[in-house]
């Protein structure tokens, strides 16, 4: 039992079972034992690889996509670039590099990051740029935003609800035989009737992210008032159903209750939930990541880059292209959705 397991065990014995969202927040963000406090999760030597770390092509194409979408709005106000959960800063660095000669593209960057360790990596990778770190979106000054959220929403804590014979119960984390274990609340819950809960049958699990609505509402408020675009890329689907709570360690899935603080905890993103929180803006169709990248010309870009590569470098380059776009890899699992001002021209590719 590691130190955070002991702490959680003590807290549950004292306060009773905790929600999955409480468990996720403690495991990921505990100031001493949290995953993002102590780990270096990204890359082959970490626990997972995000699309920007797979190949520079991802950030280059996304950067040009955002620049074109912003240009189409013909907005003369000065915009800022915002990234939520920027990891090592690789995506923002690639975006800024590929757009450096585009006059009306933002020069000021705001990064929403809670990990002090990751902030240091971002500072190193974005040296020379105008970067400011924020704790919430309210710290962004008035004006248009070009916002990117790549694998951000999947890491936000979820709550789970189980449909029983007598109604809805919350799925909780307690202790069984001295170990962390899943259970359900004794009392049934008075759940508001929504599409999620109305059509469920006995045994169904519904996941809810409490923090999604305020974040998406704030983003859409800024875009509706000032202009800009938000591009959300994550793994998930429309009208998500079932239990998707998962833990990743060294690129493998393990029991989410094992090794708390040492594993990445996530759940799939329900894009319909994100869309319902959008106010006074347009949203794009949900598009597969692979489809978007192919429409943006990743195969052509891959061919150009391959001309100077040989042996292992060429093999790795081909594998990266496949990983980003192939239906059996990231191409279909990851989805893309954009938020834009009402009546805006839908960006090419979506």
Residue ranges of model-derived segments:
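Rossmann-like AdoMet
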Residues: 1-84, 88-136, 140-144, 161, ...
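Short glycine-enriched loops at secondary-structure junctions
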Residues: 28-33, 188, 234-238
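Conserved RecA-like P-loop NTPase ATPase core
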Residues: 58, 147, 234
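Short, glycine/acidic-enriched loop or turn micro-motifs at the edges of active sites
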Residues: 116, 153, 237
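Conserved protein kinase catalytic core
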Residues: 119, 156-157, 240
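A short SAM/SAH-binding and catalytic strip from SAM-dependent methyltransferases
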Residues: 135, 142-165, 206-210, 214, ...
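A mobile, often basic/glycine-rich helix-loop segment
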Residues: 146-197, 245-256
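Long, Lys/Arg- and hydrophobic-enriched amphipathic alpha-helices
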Residues: 192-350
